[in-house]
Amino acid sequence: MNLFDVYSLFDVTPVKAKGTRIWDDKGQEYLDLYGGHAVISVGHCHPKYVAAITDQLNKIGFYSNSVKNPLQVELAKKIGELSGLEDYSLFLINSGAEANENALKLASFHTGKDRVIAFKGAFHGRTSGAVAVTDNPKYSAPFNAHHNVTFLPLNDIEAVKTELAKGDVAAVIIEGIQGVGGIVIPDDQFLRDLRQATKEAGVVLILDEIQSGYGRSGRFFAHQWAGIKPDIVTMAKGMANGFPIGGVLISPEFEATKGMLGTTFGGNYLAMAAANAVADIFKEENLVANAFEVGEYLKNSIPASPRIKEVRGRGLMIGVEFNEPIAEIRGRLLYEKHIFTGVSGKNMIRLLAPLTLTKADVDIFIKALEDLL
């Protein structure tokens, strides 16, 4: 049997990782500024993280959600404290796409409606509902094409108000920062206006913080830069440092009923051990503040060059947009300078480093970039 061939792969085989470093099967060391696509939050193989999963596996690895699991309650408390959303409820699943699916379902339950407003450039996942609110037709099969979704220009509050006035909208879903769309940050005032407009219309506001959340932006959630409180927040990538997990934070206005949501693997013992360790490390090592400080240093250190059009982002979610395709320079960063980076579109290098990144790490990247420019 072969693997279903859907991924374009670099010719690198990682076998070991620690902190912000990765080693391949030939012993070559790399600086990781990609974080496995914004997943590695507390650094690779953090000793407290490794110990927590190992210890838990020696006790009990799995049972279903038909029994009490105190680790879930512990995680909810920690996320409430880290996020400032102590009065919200937590529903646990296994991925970001699942988080958005359940958020959309909750919104439809709550309002009795089915239309969703999403935004141009959005990416919310590849499962049925999530891909329906993703603005990229190549990800959507005919099976996914029957959802009632309206795409609007980002930051156009009047267009949103026009659609809300029709009275058939269940939810508006928006990313804290668009990642796949090119590190596009919604205007803070637009988010405040959007919160007010959805509240007045009785429409659920969903903030997709799967990539931009969990400290990556220099706030626990990127929407907190605008000072708003959504009805639902979805999260996943940084929650457990690579162990599959997702979460939905649900405001107190929503009433749970037995069976309305469910999952087999969500909230399992190993995921909870991993996520609780990550939450502890966030607090102990002040990683949200580090993401902001080192992210600002990184943005301000990018060299001026006629080849670079713009640098944008918040915290350690940064896009370096070039005036040309970046495939060559990204490949040279990997194979010559041994630095992992991400991409968005054809012209943008996307930097999604572990939140443990140091200024010394940044200096290594800047020197490499200057050499290649």
Identify what each model region corresponds to.
Residues 1-373:
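Conserved N-terminal phosphate-binding loop of PLP-dependent enzymes in the Aspartate aminotransferase
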